[in-house]
Curated annotation (Swiss-Prot):
A Gene Ontology BP annotation from the UniProt entry: mitochondrial electron transport, NADH to ubiquinone
Name of the protein: NADH-ubiquinone oxidoreductase chain 2
Gene: mt:ND2
Species annotation: Drosophila melanogaster (Fruit fly)
EC top class, as a word: translocase
Keywords: Electron transport, Membrane, Mitochondrion, Mitochondrion inner membrane, NAD, Respiratory chain, Translocase, Transmembrane, Transmembrane helix, Transport, Ubiquinone
Record field: transmembrane: 8-28, 60-80, 95-115, 121-141, 146-166, 195-215, 238-258, 273-293, 321-341
Length: 341
């Protein structure tokens, strides 16, 4: 639909919108940044040649407009309380703001729109939705001190993210439920420290990029494609599933490091109940990742072998292998660097 210059323009405006939200010192300014971000992201989603992407952009627009309306209304209520001394329950208003931000980020119990919308996106748009579009809402959530609502959202997110991915055959929905599960971990890290949240978000974004980069190159959208592709390239198949396990947080891969930090801090804060549920949910996600890996290595389907004529160029291959190296051995390298310096 757009040429590259248009995409660059919309991506730049989207980044500016997020920066306005993060640097704003008022809720009204934060709302304005979120709206700029929304209006620049929707043109990136829509595609005249793909009806599913157009439907996904409409779903995203309606959901985000609902959240933005609630956020604006709540911000006005807070301004009335602060400036006109009206008797407005501030904790109730903050709870409404928190709910609107959880809806914007796609956290449970406001996750209903997220997996269905992911199904209609290209991999690059899906990556932006799973990573960049979560920065502004999560930063605003960190300003609110409503622990009980955040605790409920964390528990529901990790459980729904784990159970929802069990019977999925679509890779995009699988990544969506994985994102909801990781969002629960990120929200729990927000309860402890903003720096731990930033570390977790960075590693999650990197691991998601490695997987979506591979899916985008080979146009992989369903599990049966994983079984039938890479029949002649065991190395690519092996590295792909190692990245899956790293994203799931299996030690000793890189994805275990942010979970390790969160587990350590939650233990120090005596949050044992929440931590137990989070770790159990992670075991469920690792179960379906391992099940996919086992099936893909044990079973080969040869119907679609003609599709393997599409070759991966050397630049993409080298880039993917470098990122995979850090994904698999990153924890060892960071530990070595820590002990040396």
């Amino acid at each position: 639909m757009f040429n590259n210059s248009s995409k660059i323009l919309f991506i730049t405006i989207m980044i500016i919108g997020t920066l306005i939200t993060v640097t704003s010192n008022s809720w009204l300014g934060a709302w304005m940044g979120l709206e700029i971000n929304l209006l620049s992201f929707i043109p990136l989603l829509s595609d005249n040649n793909n009806l599913m992407s157009t439907e996904a952009s409409l779903k995203y627009f309606l959901t985000q407009v609902l959240a933005s309306t609630v956020l604006l209304f709540s911000s006005i209520l807070l301004m009335l309380k602060n400036n006109m001394n009206n008797e407005i329950n501030e904790s109730f208003t903050s709870m409404i703001i928190m709910s609107a931000l959880l809806l914007k980020s796609g956290a449970a119990p406001f996750h209903f729109w997220f997996p269905n919308m992911m199904e209609g996106l290209t991999w690059m748009n899906a990556l932006m939705l799973m990573t960049w579009q979560k920065i502004a809402p999560l930063m605003l959530i960190s300003y609110l001190n409503i622990k009980y609502l955040l605790l409920i959202s964390v528990i529901l997110s990790v459980i729904i993210g784990a159970i929802g991915g069990l019977n999925q055959t679509s890779l995009r929905k699988l990544m969506a439920f994985s994102s909801i599960n990781h969002l629960g971990w990120m929200l729990s890290s927000l309860m402890i420290s903003e720096s731990i949240w930033l570390i977790y978000f960075f590693f999650y974004s990197f691991l998601s990029f490695v997987l979506t980069f591979m899916f985008n190159i080979f146009k992989l959208f369903h599990l049966n494609q994983l079984f039938s592709w890479f029949v002649n390239s065991k190395i690519l198949k092996f590295t792909l599933f190692m990245n899956f396990l790293s994203l799931g947080g299996l030690p000793p891969f890189l994805g275990f490091l942010p979970k390790w930090l969160v587990i350590q801090q939650l233990t120090l804060c005596n949050q044992y109940f929440m931590l137990t549920l989070m770790m159990m949910s992670t075991l469920i996600t690792l179960f379906f990742y391992l099940r996919i890996c086992y099936s893909a290595f044990m079973m080969n389907y040869f119907e679609n072998n003609w599709i393997m004529k599409m070759n991966m160029n050397s630049i993409n291959y080298n880039m993917y292998m470098i990122m995979t190296f850090f994904s698999i051995f990153g924890l060892f390298l960071i530990s070595l660097f820590y002990f040396m310096f």
